[in-house]
Amino acid sequence: MKIKLVTVGKLKEKYLKEGIAEYSKRLSRFTKVEIIELADEKTPDKASPLENQQILSKEGERILSKVLDREFVIVLAIEGQQFPSEKFSKVIEDASVRGFSDITFIIGGSLGLSAKVKERANLLMSFGQLTLPHQLMRLVLMEQIYRAFMIQQGSPYHK
């Protein structure tokens, strides 16, 4: 199995890079992890709704170019389903059982994601109604993926 994160924007903060590297290392016991950072479009300060849609469309095209047909795709979106960690672990396990060898998580940029990206999702998932920086969301997601694998192992990590 391979876990792939497709994200918009470059990670700059050292503490986030270190945290993600730590969880990538921990996850390497269970799965291969690939992180793809895509360039984000520059958004004018007072962008019109049309300009925002054009930006989302361009970013969406770049995202979808990194997603293969055979991948189980989980898109992080505020309107998605919310799960406790145990259920999230089961979602990952079930995708593998159903024959998906790769699970791809998609995190959009500051404007979110295009409708086409959301339509490609096998699952829309939300971490709640809070607004979080998309860079921080990468770290939170990596921890939850690690937690999911630890739950599958019956580890005391999840307590």
UniProtKB/Swiss-Prot annotation:
Localization: Cytoplasm
* Gene Ontology, cellular component aspect: cytoplasm
User: Which Enzyme Commission number(s) are on file for it?
Assistant: 2.1.1.177
- Note whether Cell division occurs among the keywords: no
Molecular function as annotated in GO:
rRNA (pseudouridine-N3-)-methyltransferase activity
- Give, as one word, the top-level EC class: transferase
- Which keywords does this Swiss-Prot/TrEMBL entry list? Cytoplasm, Methyltransferase, rRNA processing, S-adenosyl-L-methionine, Transferase
Binding positions for S-adenosyl-L-methionine per the UniProt entry: L76, G108, F127, G128, Q129, L130, T131, L132
Cystine links in this protein are: none
Q: What is its main location?
A: cytoplasm
Could you name the domain of life of the organism this protein comes from? Bacteria
Per its record, the protein catalyses: pseudouridine(1915) in 23S rRNA + S-adenosyl-L-methionine = N(3)-methylpseudouridine(1915) in 23S rRNA + S-adenosyl-L-homocysteine + H(+)
The record's annotation in Pfam families points to: SPOUT_MTase
Protein family membership: Belongs to the RNA methyltransferase RlmH family.
Q: What does this protein do?
A: Specifically methylates the pseudouridine at position 1915 (m3Psi1915) in 23S rRNA.
Its assembly, as annotated, is: Homodimer.
The protein's name in its UniProt record: Ribosomal RNA large subunit methyltransferase H
Q: What is the lineage of its organism?
A: Bacteria, Bacillati, Bacillota, Bacilli, Lactobacillales
Which gene is annotated as encoding this protein in its UniProt record?
rlmH
